[in-house]
Amino acid sequence: MYKTYHEIELKFLIDNPRLVHMILKKHKAKFIGKVFEKTLRFDTPNNELEQMGKFLRIRTGFKNVITFKHKIKNRNFKEREEIELEIEDPIKMRQILENLGFTKVLIMEKYREKWWLNNTEIDIDKLPMGSFVEIEGKPREIRQVAKLLQLDFIKRITDNYWDLWAIFTRRNGIKSKNIVFNAVKDIKK
């Protein structure tokens, strides 16, 4: 069974994940779990999906899913139409996609903590380029939770992690198009 979903979210770069944890616990947010996620992003050799604002991925972590996303224009929030299907075997699904011509594959690694508070999903993500809070829900609730977490709405990020990675790699002279921890091991902090 698949689900179609209208996704609205924002992310914020954070320096102090501990502070976010403390605030979430103080407000009795429900902790769902922590996991290492690996995402394989697929496209044609000519990047046809990316050019159309579309995104196809397989993600392993809390569960194994294949997801198709399509951008919706929104200046204040990251908004997408999403179709997601839980899959049993990510390796076989990858083989199917590659045989259909989706041979360009990019990899993203991240550690994700999932929380629920005030009808929003709050993810604390650790990626090679930093830590982020991602808040998903309805716009009003996203704003309320961002304020509760002491996140400045003006500093919200609507770019996806791939766009942020492209900026980060240019600034730091990294050649990898894959968002992997091994790519940043030599960067001096």
Briefly describe each language-model feature range.
Residues 142-154:
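Acidic (Asp/Glu-rich), glycine- and aromatic
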Residues 19-20, 141-143:
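Short acidic, Gly/Pro-enriched loop/turn segments at secondary-structure junctions
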